[in-house]
Amino acid sequence: MYLAGSGKTTLLSLLTGDHPQAYANDMSLFGRKRGTGESIWDIKQRIGLVSPEIHLYFNQQMTALMAAGTGFFDVVVPRKLTSEQENSVRQLFSEFNMMDLIDRKLIDMSTGEQRLVLLVRSLVKSPSLLIWDEPFQGLDEKMIGSVTGWLENHMRPDQTLIVVTHHEEEIPHAVNQRYMLPMLSDKVT
């Protein structure tokens, strides 16, 4: 959990390698010190990300299948999927009872349906680290139940899930540790 102004955006961008300070400071992720030869793409390959910001970058003419498939490549532009990748996406849509959305364009979906597609996108490559920033924004109770139920049944012991939220009740039961970021002061010392 976090308070507004607590540094959440900076912390997440450090984890994902999107912040220049991720390489300028002594940091390790996945057992490797940053700046020791891994590319940002090596890091991103092990991370599944959902955020309100990423939602803005998707072409609304993309189908749900295309949008979810971009998770294999850590980009927001669709690429050709292998049959194995497409089958993985279809399997997740089936597990989330979303097969009716798979061929629909994002523009023809509600915000909640789009967010579910992006949640599936974060899972397609079975990453070791899931970072979900406000994942349930726009989802109704049934959708949230579907996601949390999936987590209860499918999270692996070697996976880590970081959920960033303002609301304690949105933290899935699969999360067994919590930390509230304190408010940062206006002064940097």
List PLM regions with ranges:
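A short, proline-enriched helix->beta-strand linker immediately N-terminal to the Walker B motif
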Residues: 124-128
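Helix-to-loop junction immediately C-terminal to a conserved catalytic motif
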Residues: 16-17
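Catalytic Walker B motif of ABC-type/P-loop ATPase nucleotide-binding domains
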Residues: 130-134
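ABC ATPase NBD Q-loop/coupling interface
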Residues: 26-42
